[in-house]
Amino acid sequence: MSLVLLPAVDVVNGEAVRLVQGEAGSETGYGSPRDAALAWQNDGAEWVHIVDLDAAFGRGSNRELLADVVGELDVQVELSGGIRDDASLEAALATGCGRVNLGTAAIENPEWCARAIAKYGEKIAVGLDVRLVDGEYQLRGRGWVTEGGNLWETLARLDKDGCSRYVVTDVSKDGTLTGPNLELLAQVCAATDAPVVASGGVSTIDDLRAIAGLVDQGVEGSIVGKALYAGRFTLPEALAAVSG
């Protein structure tokens, strides 16, 4: 089985951007989300990972624009950012996306999250945004600004709730081009039977090959963002390197 690559389109104020370590104000603009997403589709992506950063930070949303983008794409979309109640979840699913990624809601409102998982099953992935604090993996909430508790306790709870998939981000790596946290990915895979999508830190084709080496342990895919936008490699090159 080959590693699924999900090129990322992060959206702020109607524009595709990349942040460094998720910090507001560190964004670099890359034009229209529609053009970015269509470019990844044309380059061979099977999935595109689209994040509404305004919604994630709680400062507005790009919902209508993103619904239009999802509608134009022929490939599957994983939609993320600010999905934390029935209205935002139903609006996200109504775009026709393949699945949504819940983040903050899984930490702040576990009962609602459990209901969403029970109702929508495979349509729900949970984003585990992790930072190493005093030797322990802690979760980060709302746009990575708030504390979210212990990773392993939350993972055990979500497994019990029947979560179908986890998107694991080492926040300290995201947008830095410093390489993925393979140890964290392996530990999460060991702790759950659900498939894991890796996110954060990918800078080279070799990084993707290293993540692909964890497919047998449970890693299903990898989100790739800044490395593609910065021209470190092309999506066709990356797809060729990790195809089973």
Curated annotation (Swiss-Prot):
Please give the Pfam families that the UniProt record associates with this protein: His_biosynth
In which compartments does the protein localize? Cytoplasm
**Keywords from the UniProt entry:** Amino-acid biosynthesis, Cytoplasm, Histidine biosynthesis, Isomerase
Q: Which reaction does it catalyse?
A: 1-(5-phospho-beta-D-ribosyl)-5-[(5-phospho-beta-D-ribosylamino)methylideneamino]imidazole-4-carboxamide = 5-[(5-phospho-1-deoxy-D-ribulos-1-ylimino)methylamino]-1-(5-phospho-beta-D-ribosyl)imidazole-4-carboxamide
Q: Where is the catalytic site?
A: 10 (proton acceptor), 129 (proton donor)
Q: Which GO terms describe its molecular function?
A: 1-(5-phosphoribosyl)-5-[(5-phosphoribosylamino)methylideneamino]imidazole-4-carboxamide isomerase activity; phosphoribosylanthranilate isomerase activity
Q: Which GO terms describe its cellular component?
A: cytoplasm
Please name the pathway: Amino-acid biosynthesis; L-histidine biosynthesis; L-histidine from 5-phospho-alpha-D-ribose 1-diphosphate: step 4/9
Which EC numbers does the record give? 5.3.1.16
What's the superkingdom here?
A: Bacteria
Entry-linked InterPro entries: Aldolase_TIM (IPR013785), His_biosynth (IPR006062), HisA/PriA_Actinobacteria (IPR010188), Isoase_HisA-like (IPR044524), Isoase_HisA-like_bact (IPR023016), RibuloseP-bd_barrel (IPR011060)
| Biological processes annotated in GO | L-histidine biosynthetic process; L-tryptophan biosynthetic process
- Name the protein family: Belongs to the HisA/HisF family.
Which PANTHER family does the record cross-reference, listed alphabetically? 1-(5-PHOSPHORIBOSYL)-5-[(5-PHOSPHORIBOSYLAMINO)METHYLIDENEAMINO] IMIDAZOLE-4-CARBOXAMIDE ISOMERASE (PTHR43090:SF2)
NCBIfam families, alphabetized: hisA-trpF
Protein name (database record): 1-(5-phosphoribosyl)-5-[(5-phosphoribosylamino)methylideneamino] imidazole-4-carboxamide isomerase
Organism whose genome encodes this protein: Rhodococcus jostii (strain RHA1)
